[in-house]
Amino acid sequence: MLHFVGGKNTFDQHHGPLFIDENFANIRGPGEAIGIHSGHHEGLQRNHFRFQEGKFHCGQVNILLALKDIGPGDGGTVIIPSSHKSNIRHPEFEKNSMKKGKVTSAENMTASKEIYLKAGDGLLFVDSLCHGSAKRTNKGERRIVVYRYGPSWGFFRHPYRPSKKLLSNLTEFQKKIVMPHEQVLSPNNKENKII
């Protein structure tokens, strides 16, 4: 993961080697899907992609681990190859993008590729790659675990924080990955407690 997130002796590793931004399980049943999202055209710092002087500098790298086989009809992850390098929005992006209250999927987009995995397989990709999922048409559930890593200067996008108990059980190296910031200041945090 260090190979993709940032370079040694750069600002990307100012607080630690990298940052595990989030991890979660995703369970999806028949008829469910995730519309296309991300893409380099959005220009977000959080999920940027850059390759310079022989080194990767990725704002967020995802690892999807299949807990069950994912084949045709199982709602596999869909990617748009090379979209992490394009500054131009895919012409079918809006039609297939994530929308609240509406199930959209990405498997019929031009140039899209649905990825099939065996239980235990992992899929690694930079978050600026346009991705989503196909609609699950088979019975049963698609089950995956997602881990997202980024440079040490990143911070949680959701209000979840590692517990003091978890942090006390980690090595110093592990702590730098799970919580690279020793103290986080906030204008609403008068006592300057870690938030």
Q: Positions of the model-derived regions?
A:
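Non-heme Fe(II) oxygenase catalytic core, chiefly the N-lobe of the double-stranded beta-helix
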Residues: 1-119, 132, 137-140, 151-161
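Non-heme Fe(II)/2-oxoglutarate
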Residues: 93, 122-124, 128-195
